[in-house]
A protein has these predicted regions:
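Hydrophobic anchor residue at the start of the ABC signature
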Residues: 6, 10, 282
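Conserved ABC ATPase "signature" region
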Residues: 191-195, 246-263
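Conserved ABC ATPase signature
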Residues: 268-272, 276
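Conserved catalytic motifs of ABC-family nucleotide-binding domains
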Residues: 289
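Charged, flexible cofactor/metal-binding loops and thiol motifs
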Residues: 56-117, 129-135
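ABC ATPase NBD Q-loop/coupling interface
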Residues: 12, 184-206, 243
Length: 299
């Protein structure tokens, strides 16, 4: 879950230590790129069972098991044709349930051509604390500098950059968790243009039903004192959506959508792995059926 530069440095350190100390390294990862660059012998597992094992060439050049073949097809390639989609490992059979029935349809004539979100010249700087003995003038760090973009409805936009380049800061400004120094954020609320930065606190609470956030860290973003059911349904309670029965059904449907066992709704976050916790965070963000979902590296 690191950016490529930091990841490469850590992997190089592991490789150097392995050589210096003449030891073996057992690496558990879901990243096939890391496996290809680091591993000599590979074991592919799924649900606690070994699907296939072998050397580097066997796994990457001559896969035998259907699951391993599906893994390779699901990895992005440079030779993908325009419009070509990756092949999912498993298709989720989703029947129309609570979420689809409760979703308010987008009016056909409501600003169909306008972008869902428009960001103009967004900037944010942070003050640097005075550290000199004589207390010189404090400096600034420009975290976001004049960023502009548009997101059409039904489209995805990816922001790419190394750690510390301002991706999370920008995301938090879109959600109004941080206030920008300059710029404008305009949201197309079914044809009505909303100045996000001008919303009052009361208006902002209602607005966040339309825009949700998936946090980068699945450990600190989940309340350890709350069971999964309460975590997923908390947004519904805050916004007064549904009754106990409908919220229970929504929680079950969301658990199925993110590939988690419905029987685990009463468990606490410490019972889950990092990847499972991230799925819980995704389920929570989807509970309100937002029109826009901001994902802060939800890997």
């Amino acid at each position: 879950a690191l950016d490529v530069t930091i990841q490469a440095q850590i992997l190089k350190l592991l490789r150097d230590l392995q050589g210096e100390l003449d030891m073996a390294v057992l690496m558990i990862t879901h990243d096939l790129g890391v496996v290809a660059n680091m591993a000599e012998n590979i074991v592919v597992m799924h649900h606690g069972e070994v699907m296939e094992s072998g050397g580097l060439n066997d796994i990457f050049r001559n896969p035998q098991h259907p699951y391993l073949k599906a893994l390779h097809k699901a990895v992005p390639r440079f030779d993908l044709a325009p419009g070509e989609r990756l092949v999912p490992i498993r298709e989720i059979e989703h029947h129309k349930g609570f979420l689809q029935e409760a979703k308010e349809p987008w009016p056909e004539t409501a600003g169909a051509e306008a972008p869902l979100l428009k960001v103009e010249n967004l900037s944010k700087a942070f003050q640097i604390r005075k550290s000199s003995l004589f207390g010189g003038a404090a400096g600034q760090v420009k975290a976001v500098d004049g960023v502009s973009f548009e997101i059409p409805r039904g489209e995805c936009l990816g922001l790419v950059g190394e750690s510390g380049c301002g991706k999370t800061t920008l995301s938090k400004m879109l959600m109004r968790a941080l206030s920008p120094d300059t710029g404008a954020v305009t949201y197309n609320d079914r044809g009505a243009l909303v100045d996000v930065l001008a919303l009052t606190q009361h208006e902002l609470t209602s607005f966040r039903r339309k825009m949700q956030f998936i946090f980068q860290d699945p450990f600190s973003s989940l309340n350890p004192r709350m069971p999964v059911f309460d975590i997923i349904t908390e947004p519904l309670v805050i916004h007064g959506i549904g009754d106990d029965d409908s919220r229970r059904e929504a929680a079950r449907e969301l658990m199925r959508l993110v590939g988690l066992d419905v029987r685990h709704l009463n468990r606490y976050p410490h019972s889950f792995s990092g990847g499972q916790r991230q799925r819980i965070g995704i389920a929570r963000a989807l509970a309100l059926q937002p029109d826009l979902l901001i994902c802060d590296e939800p890997v």
